[in-house]
């Protein structure tokens, strides 16, 4: 069971890294140039919207974190590590939770900004940007789908981390470690 769970966690982490990198690349490399007025060109990039910049930073950080944990897993699987497994399990569980929530929050904030770009807001006199930059908006939508898929993968990873932490505690006594 432990070997199967370890393989599953590695597969989930690799999948999450790939989807997170795909999300960051889709957002960061997405540009579209349109002629706005006779000879004036406007270029839409991810730098035009702070939510898109934050999404790129958060997804890159989450991918890096998952890559570090893959390295930790490969080092610990080769050597017989006799450290505080409980402490490391709690740290990994907490960081997994933070990574999931940050990725989900960045995707949701970007989704809110994307809705404003699609529909505009007459009260704030914001124009519908996606009428002019359709391809840009479609690619950002694809990136958001990838981002939410990555959030779901990382939530599954977090459940495995939770299992690793709480299996060490006694089912009969509240927060008491199992006796060896």
Curated annotation (Swiss-Prot):
Keywords from the named record: Cell membrane, Membrane, Transmembrane, Transmembrane helix
Positions in the Cytoplasmic compartment: 1-8, 72-97, 161-180
GO CC, one annotated term: plasma membrane
Extracellular topological segments: 30-50, 119-139
Compartment(s): Cell membrane
Main location: membrane
Membrane topology value: Multi-pass membrane protein
Annotated Pfam families: CASP_dom (PF04535)
Transmembrane segments: 9-29, 51-71, 98-118, 140-160
The keyword Membrane appears for this protein: yes
Family that this chain belongs to: Belongs to the Casparian strip membrane proteins (CASP) family.
Oligomeric form and interacting partners: Homodimer and heterodimers.
Protein name: CASP-like protein 2C1
């Amino acid at each position: 069971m432990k070997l199967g769970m370890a393989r599953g966690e590695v597969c989930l982490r690799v999948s999450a890294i790939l989807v997170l990198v795909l999300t960051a690349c889709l957002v960061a490399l997405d540009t579209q140039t349109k002629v706005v007025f006779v000879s004036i060109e406007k270029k839409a990039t991810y730098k035009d919207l702070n939510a898109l910049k934050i999404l790129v930073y958060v997804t890159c950080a989450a991918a890096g974190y998952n890559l570090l944990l893959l390295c930790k897993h490969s080092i610990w699987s080769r050597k017989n590590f006799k450290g505080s497994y409980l402490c490391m399990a709690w740290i990994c569980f907490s960081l997994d939770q933070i990574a999931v929530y940050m990725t989900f929050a960045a995707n949701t904030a970007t989704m809110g900004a994307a809705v404003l770009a699609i529909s505009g807001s007459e009260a704030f006199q914001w124009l519908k940007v996606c009428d002019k930059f359709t391809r840009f908006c479609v690619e950002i939508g694809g990136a958001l789908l990838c981002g939410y898929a990555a959030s779901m993968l990382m939530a599954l990873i977090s459940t495995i981390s939770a299992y690793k932490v709480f299996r060490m505690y006694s089912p009969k006594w509240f927060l008491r470690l199992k006796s060896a």
